[in-house]
Amino acid sequence: SGHLLLLLGLLTLWAELTPVSGAAKYCKLPLRIGPCKRKIPSFYYKWKAKQCLPFDYSGCGGNANRFKTIEECRRTCVG
């Protein structure tokens, strides 16, 4: 019972940390800050440079290539 619980916990952790197969699709999207006026510190993945870079998100619009932290960007797009 204890081993089964440990295995279940490890599988859950693995599932949470493994990037989704569709992630690369939106990592290739161009930077879109959106049309609104706010300046929310965010990160996007620059496909050609193969790196996560900072930008100020406007608060609306944009696309899925937008992350709250550089760690989230790297985990999703860099691997």
Swiss-Prot record:
The UniProt-reported impact of residue 38 to A is: Slight decrease in binding affinity for Kv
Stated consequence of mutating residue 75 to A: Slight decrease in binding affinity for Kv
The effect of residue 74 to A is: Slight decrease in binding affinity for Kv
Which Cys pairs does UniProt list as disulfide-bonded?
27-77, 36-60, 52-73
Effect of substituting residue 74 to A: No change in binding affinity for Kv
Please report the stretch or stretches of sequence annotated as the BPTI/Kunitz inhibitor domain: 27-77
Site annotation (Important for binding to potassium channels): which residues? Answer: 25, 28, 47-48
User: Mind listing the UniProt keywords for this protein, alphabetically?
Assistant: Disulfide bond, Ion channel impairing toxin, Neurotoxin, Potassium channel impairing toxin, Secreted, Signal, Toxin, Voltage-gated potassium channel impairing toxin
Effect noted on mutating residue 47 to A: Decrease in binding affinity for Kv
Q: Which GO terms describe its cellular component?
A: extracellular space
| Record protein name field | Kunitz-type serine protease inhibitor homolog dendrotoxin K
Please give the organism.
Dendroaspis polylepis polylepis
